[in-house]
C-alpha cells in the first residue's frame, strides 16, 4: 500500500513525523508537506508562481506551497504513481466544527478526495504543543487499515479528532457530526515605529456548543471523533424555500 502523508504544520512538525513512523508499519510512506507552517490556509492553491520541492530525506519532500499544493505535487509528480490513500496530519490542535473551513489539514484530505483517492485528516485536540501524537498516529494507522479494506463512500473523507490523552485514558471512538463554534470576532490593532497600523486577527474567545453527537462533544469526553465529510456543499434543506422565490422578476 502506497501512502501519501501531508499536513499544514510543516514537514518538520512532530505530528507528521509521528504519523509517518506509524504508517511505515503498514505501507510505503512518502511525505510531501509544506516547508513551513501553513495553518489556516484552507484550500488555497498556488497558481501565480512556481513551486519548488526538495527531498530533504529519502521519501520526504519539503514544498514551498500549501497543503493542497503538496497533495497535487505528490499525486501527479513526486510519487511516480497514485497513492492508495492520503493521510493529512497529525495536526497540532483540533479541527472541529466550523473550523474545518479554515483548515489546511482538512483541505489537503479534500483535495485527495476530489481526485478520487481515499483520505483522512487527523488532528490532536490539544490546547498546547501536544503530548500524545503517538497515540493519535497509532489510531490513524488502524483506521487506514480499515479504510483500505472497506473503502469509503464516494466523495467522502474522514475528519478524525483525537483527544490529547494517554492511550489508557481514551474512551474509544465514535462517529460524529460536525459541531458548531460561536465566534467572537476581534481584531487587535497596533502601531509600528513608523506610525503605520498593523493588525492581528483572531484574538477573540472561541467556544464550541456542547451538542450531543458532535465532534466537540465526543472529544470533550475523551472519545476519538470520526466525522464523515463530503464535498457537496449544497444546502438541500433550503432548496424548497428558494424555489418559491420568483427569480424571473429580477432585472440585471
Swiss-Prot record:
InterPro entries: SurE (IPR030048), SurE-like_Pase/nucleotidase (IPR002828), SurE-like_sf (IPR036523)
Protein name as catalogued: 5'-nucleotidase SurE
Cofactor details (free text): Binds 1 divalent metal cation per subunit.
Cofactor(s) listed in the protein's UniProt record: a divalent metal cation
UniProt enzyme class: hydrolase
Entry similarity comment: Belongs to the SurE nucleotidase family.
The EC number(s) this enzyme carries: 3.1.3.5
One Gene Ontology MF term: metal ion binding
One Pfam family per UniProt: SurE
UniProt binding sites for a divalent metal cation: 8-9, 39, 91
Subcellular location(s) per record: Cytoplasm
CC per GO annotation: cytoplasm
UniProt organism field: Geobacter metallireducens (strain ATCC 53774 / DSM 7210 / GS-15)
UniProt keyword list: Cytoplasm, Hydrolase, Metal-binding, Nucleotide-binding
Its job: Nucleotidase that shows phosphatase activity on nucleoside 5'-monophosphates.
Main localization (coarse): cytoplasm
Reaction equations catalysed: a ribonucleoside 5'-phosphate + H2O = a ribonucleoside + phosphate
Amino acid at each position: 500500500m502506497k501512502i501519501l502523508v501531508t499536513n499544514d504544520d510543516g514537514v518538520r512538525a512532530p505530528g507528521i513525523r509521528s504519523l509517518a513512523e506509524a504508517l511505515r508499519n503498514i505501507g510505503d510512506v512518502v511525505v510531501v508537506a509544506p516547508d513551513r507552517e501553513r495553518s489556516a490556509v484552507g484550500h488555497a492553491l498556488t497558481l501565480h508562481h512556481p513551486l519548488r520541492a526538495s527531498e530533504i530525506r529519502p521519501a520526504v519532500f519539503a514544498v514551498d506551497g500549501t497543503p493542497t499544493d503538496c497533495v497535487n505535487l505528490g499525486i501527479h509528480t513526486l510519487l511516480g504513481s497514485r497513492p492508495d490513500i492520503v493521510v493529512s496530519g497529525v495536526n497540532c490542535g483540533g479541527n472541529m466544527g466550523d473550523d474545518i473551513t479554515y483548515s489546511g489539514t482538512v483541505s489537503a484530505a479534500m483535495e485527495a478526495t476530489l481526485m478520487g483517492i481515499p483520505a483522512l485528516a487527523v488532528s490532536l485536540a490539544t490546547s498546547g504543543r501536544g503530548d500524545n501524537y503517538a497515540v493519535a498516529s497509532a489510531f490513524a494507522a488502524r483506521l487506514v487499515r480499515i479504510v483500505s479494506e472497506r473503502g469509503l463512500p464516494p466523495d467522502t473523507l474522514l475528519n478524525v479528532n483525537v483527544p490529547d490523552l494517554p492511550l489508557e485514558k481514551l474512551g474509544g471512538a465514535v462517529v460524529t457530526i460536525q459541531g458548531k463554534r460561536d465566534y467572537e470576532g476581534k481584531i487587535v490593532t497596533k502601531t509600528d515605529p513608523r506610525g503605520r497600523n498593523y493588525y492581528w486577527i483572531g484574538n477573540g474567545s472561541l467556544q464550541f456548543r456542547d451538542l450531543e453527537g458532535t465532534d466537540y462533544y465526543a472529544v470533550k469526553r475523551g472519545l476519538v471523533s470520526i466525522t464523515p465529510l463530503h464535498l457537496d456543499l449544497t444546502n438541500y434543506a433550503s432548496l424548497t424555500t428558494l424555489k418559491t422565490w420568483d427569480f424571473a422578476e429580477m432585472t440585471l
